[in-house]
């Protein structure tokens, strides 16, 4: 299972929001590229980038920064946030992005998603951002009447490669992942799923790892890494390739490059 660090971009900085609230912004670093290189050095198998400006406005505000990050890394990068047109997705892939995570457009223009999935097989994923089980859109500012499980089944039928499931009410809270909701989703789709939202500790990572036989392939971690509640190297050793059965205590400390 992949443990995937998240870098949320807002105004060119690395930030975290609490439950997707743009009024509750914590700036963790002014240089997202330095953060990306740091996570790669600690063993991240891939990186999850979110353009929060684009998620809110639909305009790619951090396009150049994303390209710079992708060009500087050796690990694959997946990007979400505000990808609502064919051109926006094509531009990202031209920059070397590995996967595009589509959100709002999956509800508003499913035919476009199906077309993109056919054009870029294996590279189009859908972000299922759920509030009380219902899909939220436009940077989580609006909540639909569509269940995440229903959207997942529709999108799987249209050929998307997988899903990133985020429990909005747990995102940025360190309250632990929503295991029951993940089980429900995994039960209705045969596509791989990446979990996001609330992951706070190595125990949470191990709880998610128990779902891998059912199709869970990764966990996105944000605040727990930035507040040092979790050590990325330990998490990767615990559930990644060549994982250790016993995790030694981390007696050292880490600092930014």
UniProtKB/Swiss-Prot annotation:
Q: In which pathway does it act?
A: Amino-acid biosynthesis; L-histidine biosynthesis; L-histidine from 5-phospho-alpha-D-ribose 1-diphosphate: step 4/9
Under InterPro entries, the record lists: Aldolase_TIM, His_biosynth, HisA_bact_arch, Isoase_HisA-like, Isoase_HisA-like_bact, RibuloseP-bd_barrel
Q: Which PANTHER family match?
A: 1-(5-PHOSPHORIBOSYL)-5-[(5-PHOSPHORIBOSYLAMINO)METHYLIDENEAMINO] IMIDAZOLE-4-CARBOXAMIDE ISOMERASE
Q: Which gene encodes it?
A: hisA
Where found, per UniProt? Answer: Cytoplasm
Name the chain's protein: 1-(5-phosphoribosyl)-5-[(5-phosphoribosylamino)methylideneamino] imidazole-4-carboxamide isomerase
- Family membership: Belongs to the HisA/HisF family.
- All disulfide bonds of the chain are none
Write down the Pfam families for this protein, in alphabetical order: His_biosynth (PF00977)
Organism per entry: Thermosynechococcus vestitus (strain NIES-2133 / IAM M-273 / BP-1)
Q: Which GO terms describe its molecular function?
A: 1-(5-phosphoribosyl)-5-[(5-phosphoribosylamino)methylideneamino]imidazole-4-carboxamide isomerase activity
The UniProt entry's GO CC annotations, sorted and at most eight, read: cytoplasm
Alphabetic keyword roster: Amino-acid biosynthesis, Cytoplasm, Histidine biosynthesis, Isomerase
């Amino acid at each position: 299972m992949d443990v995937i660090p998240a870098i949320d971009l807002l105004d060119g900085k690395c930030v975290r929001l609490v439950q997707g609230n743009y009024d509750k912004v914590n700036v963790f670093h002014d240089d997202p590229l330095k953060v990306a290189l740091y996570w790669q050095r600690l063993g991240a198998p891939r990186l999850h980038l979110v353009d929060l400006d684009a998620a809110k406005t639909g305009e790619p505000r951090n396009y150049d920064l994303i390209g710079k990050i992708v060009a500087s890394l050796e690990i694959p990068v997946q990007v979400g946030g505000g990808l609502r047109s064919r051109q926006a997705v094509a531009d990202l892939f031209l920059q070397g992005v590995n996967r595009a995570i589509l959100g709002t457009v999956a509800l508003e223009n499913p035919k476009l998603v199906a077309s993109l999935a056919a054009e870029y097989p294996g590279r189009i994923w859908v972000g299922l951002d759920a509030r009380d089980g219902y899909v939220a859109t436009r940077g989580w500012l609006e909540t639909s009447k569509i269940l995440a499980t229903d959207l997942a089944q529709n999108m799987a039928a249209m050929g998307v490669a997988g899903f990133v499931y985020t429990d909005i009410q747990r995102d940025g809270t360190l309250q632990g992942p929503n295991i029951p909701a993940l089980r429900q989703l995994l039960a209705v789709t045969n596509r791989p799923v990446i979990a996001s939202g609330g992951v706070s500790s190595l125990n949470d990572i191990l709880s998610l790892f128990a779902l891998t036989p059912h199709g869970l392939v990764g966990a996105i971690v944000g605040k727990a890494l930035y507040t040092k509640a979790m050590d990325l190297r330990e998490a990767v050793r615990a559930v990644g390739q060549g994982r250790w059965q016993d995790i030694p205590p981390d007696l050292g400390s880490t600092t930014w490059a």
